């Protein structure tokens, strides 16, 4: 049907007959001469038709998004008529034949216009996908998937599919449940990850497994979350942390070659505690400096009892300083107020600061600090004339969080972030357990190998867990797994999953660990998130062909939707409205 894609027509085709196909991107009638910009997956080429052509009458019928097949002679555009913005900007095709394969209603969205309301774009996603930018995104997505497959296959990994209909197990988020028609009152769960099955593959001697896996989590959505998502998932036997990290680094190095970027390996490694204390995040963005500095001891003799009491509880409290170089010249009083309001939404009671002037130091904290304390703060933060030093004080977890967010906010305001940089980092030595309102739970998942399970202070137990971070975004992570039944039971006990419950939920895993499970570990990389970063897209929805909204609905198909009474009966389900009493 065609001899060339639109942008394949070049100067070497001058005076030759070519045949192209695609959609009418724009239509113009200039004094009887018709110009059509034809668009296909490769880009645009200009068609031109004057009244002498036998295709002229047909060309007059063309409108936006009509599907066309065009045949004509390629020629150079006239002097001054070239379009340097187009790959085909020096040439045009003089129409000899034109077939309208299909007409189009007036499109409800302008193809390629990112300023169109996102809900409207998602409702007409098939039109939104016609944009050249969308094609480039999904072309890269396809290339990256192929690179991942080839790279892992060359390293001896087997691509093996794991079940989609599985057993509900607690992994941190709610499961999507599927009622069984055959087993009345029982449910399958869609997998949040292939975690347990890939471990069982290692028990089964598969040695190295991978898949590009579909996963499902019924959780509150954010810009980088979807209820169904894809991850590059892998597991390997007889390995340690270094082996797994090496595979991930090799994989990402090959993937980033696809966009012409050579990333240095090995990646820098940073312990979790260092990341939290110095950057206020377990996924620090290291494209810029601005570290947090601990200054609690500088307030030990403060005349302000609030600060001095915080300083004396170094286990549970923190006083952190953030020196913003040169900020005194650019941060007005209104900006300082804006920053205070910003951190307030994350639990800060206020935002104290010192302004380093040429002949004095100003700020509400000055009068509460001893001369020695002030001197130590200035030295430790390397504060100089023109700087502003911000302070966060209070509960350790809250202070680290809002000061880390302040660090990012200030970096964005001062344009300190190199948008063209790719900064990879391993965060290691995560805590094994985290405290919640209902006790402790596994920070990653309960199948991660702990480093010091016998430690009396549960919060000091670390895990053989590791996250790979790119530009302040968690790209993926993994861990060395527990491969002995006794250790798995100890971990369950630490998070109050007692023997009966453990057997009910994970009996199949505990049984498998009795039969010579090898040491093993693995990783998962968020595939959608990776493509979002590589294409510098604003939302993960831009890199998924048919994404859900932030309310977990599909505007294109109107899913989820009610089902018929007959379907409910087949599934042995009856719906009823809950009363207030039922919900209490």
UniProtKB/Swiss-Prot annotation:
It is an enzyme of class 6 (ligase). It catalyses: tRNA(Asx) + L-aspartate + ATP = L-aspartyl-tRNA(Asx) + AMP + diphosphate. It comes from the Bacteria. SUPFAM superfamilies: Class II aaRS and biotin synthetases, GAD domain-like, Nucleic acid-binding proteins. The keyword Glycosyltransferase does not apply. The keyword Nucleotide-binding applies. Keywords: Aminoacyl-tRNA synthetase, ATP-binding, Cytoplasm, Ligase, Nucleotide-binding, Protein biosynthesis. The record marks 30, 80 as: Important for tRNA non-discrimination. ATP binds at residues 217-219, 226, 474, 526-529. It is found in: Cytoplasm. L-aspartate binds at residues 171, 217, 444, 481. Residues 195-198 are annotated as: Aspartate. InterPro entries: Aa-tRNA-synt_II, aa-tRNA-synth_II, aa-tRNA-synth_II/BPL/LPL, Asp-tRNA-ligase_1, Asp-tRNA-ligase_1_N, Asp/Asn-tRNA-synth_IIb, AspRS_core, GAD-like_sf. PROSITE patterns: AA_TRNA_LIGASE_II. GO terms for biological process: aspartyl-tRNA aminoacylation. One of its GO terms (molecular function) is nucleic acid binding. Its EC number is 6.1.1.23. GO terms for cellular component: cytoplasm. Pfam families: GAD, tRNA-synt_2, tRNA_anti-codon. Belongs to the class-II aminoacyl-tRNA synthetase family. Type 1 subfamily. Aspartyl-tRNA synthetase with relaxed tRNA specificity since it is able to aspartylate not only its cognate tRNA(Asp) but also tRNA(Asn). Reaction proceeds in two steps: L-aspartate is first activated by ATP to form Asp-AMP and then transferred to the acceptor end of tRNA(Asp/Asn). Homodimer. This is Aspartate--tRNA(Asp/Asn) ligase. The gene is aspS.
